[in-house]
Each structure stands twice: as C-alpha cells, then as structure tokens.
Amino acid sequence: MAEPLFLQSQMHKKIWGGNRLRKEFGYDIPSETTGEYWAISAHPNGVSVVKNGVYKGVPLDELYAEHRELFGNSKSSVFPLLTKILDANDWLSVQVHPDNAYALEHEGELGKTECWYVISADEGAEIIYGHEAKSKEELRQMIAAGDWDHLLTKIPVKAGDFFYVPSGTMHAIGKGIMILETQQSSDTTYRVYDFDRKDDQGRKRALHIEQSIDVLTIGKPANATPAWLSLQGLETTVLVSSPFFTVYKWQISGSVKMQQTAPYLLVSVLAGQGRITVGLEQYALRKGDHLILPNTIKSWQFDGDLEIIASHSNEC
C-alpha cells in the first residue's frame, strides 16, 4: 500500500526544557520542562507509532523489523536515524558523543553523529561548538581546572542556521534556542560539564570525563557547506550529505511534483500548511507533522506553502 506513514511520538522531560514545544507547534507536553520531542524514532527509549492507514498503531521499530520492504530492504539492523525537536530553555550540558566503534564496544548501540537546524533563537543566543585545547593532555588539564572560559568555543546563532556535529565534537545548545536535530539512532551522551546545577531532587547529574576524553576530537569542527537549488515552486537546500545521512530543507510554494530518489524519506513540517498527494489520495499537512515516505511511494505532489526538513540514511 503506497501511503505516507504519519507518526505519533514521545516527549521527554529535561532539566533544561521549557514549554515552547506547545507554544510553537501546539503539542500536548507533559510538563513545563519538556525538552525533547522524538518526532521520528525507533529507538527503544522513545518509539514512534504509526497513526494512519494499514499500519495504524504499529510501533516504528516493529514495522522496520517486520516490513523491511517499506524501507528499501535496508541492511541496517536497526532503524538508523532519529529526528528530534529540542527546546532549550536553559543550556544543555557540555557533551560529546562517541563514534560507531566506541559506542558499539562500550554502550552496545550506534554512535552519534548529528546535525542541527535552528528553528528559532532568542537575541544573543549562543551554542558551544568545539574547544580550544591543542592536545588530549591539555584538554584533560583544562577540564580538571574547570577552565571553561578558555576551553569552550562559543558562537552566536540565529533562526535558519545549520550545524553539522560529528561524533567527537564538544558541543552544547544554549538557552533560548529551538532546533530540529537529525541524528544517528543513539541515546549515548557523555557529559563533560553541567554548569554545577542540580535537578529537582537536589542532585547533580553524572559526568563522564574519562569517556569524554577518550572520544573527543582535537581540532576545530568543520561545518557543512549547504548547496542551494531553486526550481519553480521549490527551493531546495542540501544542508549536509555525510556518511550517515543527507538532510534537505524544502521551501514549497504552490504545487510541486517530486520523485523518490532514496530508499525512504523522513519528513518534518516546520512551518505552513498544505497537502501531499500520493496516487489518488490526499493527506493534509500542517506545521508540526512528522511522517515517513516509504519505498512503496515512488512519486508525490506537495501543494501549499510549506517549510520542510527531509532526510534519509546513507547507511542502507
């Protein structure tokens, strides 16, 4: 059956979260400190569920395991990607993620390379993107001394910015920023620094200094260089094409016909409204929708005014 898979997904409370997932997208959030919406996920810590069509009610991990034909008969043992929206009402911890080899050996799951599309950012908002240490020994010394002002590289951000964050990159999302994150399907994070804050039980969150030093990369991160193409009714920006995923921004105005060029596509509507037509069937689209266009869909048409982030795995 050639139909898009619309998804219902899980919210995650975070010490740094807020309520902008409700304000911006109208989502039903569980608390005023909701930090993450795992919009397209088959990770066991937050599995999305199909909410329409033949597979209504089926969890995405189960669908991937039992109907691999929907995903181009992908050879990846697990659904390889995870799409999130993050609301940073405060700084996230300064952190780093391992690569596949380290994560599989030590954590039993994929590594975590990710990327961020900035949906909104307060005036003066910043991220941490890299560090100033010239060696692992200097890195260890600066962490031990708590010399964060000299170690951490801060840069200002605004809505529409994009950052590629390979495994091994020291990073943190700053206060007042909302992002859409495309990442490998992993929940492994090593915290380097958490601003000495305490949770609602008065406890500090665990740090992972030795693991962080093991996996951190020395040298400045190299951000992706987006490529832009305009056709009638469609502006396409290839935000990044990496060994793990390719991510696009589609700005749609009017009617646009498209072809499936990947085994399947992950689609997130960040703004606007419209519809997608597959064969003879039409499906409404609105801001905050997340869906998968499976391999059974070879072509479709978008109508309306829509801002979309789409992605596909490159590990199929």
From Swiss-Prot:
Keyword ATP-binding: no
Name of the molecule in the record: Mannose-6-phosphate isomerase
Gene name linked to the record: pmi
Domain of life of the native organism: Bacteria
Annotated EC: 5.3.1.8
Catalytic reaction equation(s): D-mannose 6-phosphate = D-fructose 6-phosphate
Class of the enzyme per the UniProt entry, highest EC level: isomerase
Active site: 191
Coiled-coil ranges per UniProt: none
InterPro entries: Carb_Metab_Reg_Kinase/Isom, Man6P_Isoase-1, Man6P_isomerase_Firm_short, MPI_cupin_dom, PMI_typeI_cat, RmlC-like_jellyroll, RmlC_Cupin_sf
Keywords: Isomerase, Metal-binding, Zinc
Annotated SUPFAM superfamilies: RmlC-like cupins (SSF51182)
GO molecular function: mannose-6-phosphate isomerase activity; zinc ion binding
Family statement drawn from the similarity comment of this UniProt entry: Belongs to the mannose-6-phosphate isomerase type 1 family.
Chain positions recorded as Zn(2+) binding sites: 95, 97, 114, 171
Biological processes annotated in GO: carbohydrate metabolic process
Organism, scientific name: Streptococcus mutans serotype c (strain ATCC 700610 / UA159)
Cofactor notes: Binds 1 zinc ion per subunit.
Cofactor: Zn(2+)
